[in-house]
Regions:
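Beta-strand-centric surfaces of beta-sandwich/beta-rich domains
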Residues: 1-100, 107-203
Length: 203
């Protein structure tokens, strides 16, 4: 067991983050591992969030999700968390602006216990996060290190599953450096399996 990772999870070395995601339908072009599918578009400026569900049951007095908590960064890249009360298929605007959204989860629900519909979180009509129906939280392998923090990646894993034979997934771990350059830090090709790769040296 890596006891340093346990200590990090306890908060003894600052804060640990476990990021994971899922993409249900990847084709022959590169996509980001996240609920919405396609390539993730990072905002270039902080903006108000628009939060809406595809189902009317996700509302303040509904049987589905009633409130969602959104985690991300403000215009200064500082950590910011807000809770939004849903209004079904009617969009609700946040009072705060975000330049990054990297997680959202159902924080209050009715008798259904979680969200009934898909909950989209957007800025300027572009989806920045989505909670797929029944999932209760985002599944997005996307993260930005906040201002005044230093991030270290200690490993990654990737898996694929396909019903057809001879289907392969070419996956890579991408990091944006402080100068804005995108760097591939790990890459592997798999077919109907999962690869778990701890790094001997954190990156």
């Amino acid at each position: 067991m890596d006891f340093s990772s346990v200590q990090a999870a306890k908060g003894h070395f600052g804060k640990s983050i476990y990021k994971f995601g899922f993409n249900s339908a990847i084709s022959t072009t590169e996509e980001t591992v996240w609920d919405e599918g396609g390539t993730y578009a990072y905002p270039t400026a902080a903006a108000v969030l628009s939060v809406v569900s595809s189902n009317a049951a996700d509302a303040a007095a509904g049987t589905g999700a009633r409130k969602v908590t959104i985690e991300g960064l403000d215009s200064d890249y500082k950590v910011q968390t807000v809770e939004i009360t849903l209004n079904g298929t009617n969009a609700v605007a946040s009072t705060e602006t975000f330049i990054r959204v990297y997680r959202a989860f159902v924080s209050e629900a009715g008798s259904g216990g979680t969200n009934t519909g898909a909950i989209s979180i957007s800025t300027s009509s572009t989806v920045r996060a989505e909670i797929s129906a029944g999932m209760g939280q985002t599944l997005m392998a996307v993260y930005t290190v906040p201002a005044d923090y230093t991030g270290y990646i200690v490993g990654w894993s990737i898996g694929s599953g396909a019903t057809a034979a001879n289907k392969y997934l070419d996956g890579r771990l991408i990091v944006r450096d402080p100068d804005g350059i995108l760097l591939t830090k790990a890459r592997t090709t798999i077919s109907n399996t999962t690869v778990i790769q701890p790094f001997g040296k954190a990156i």
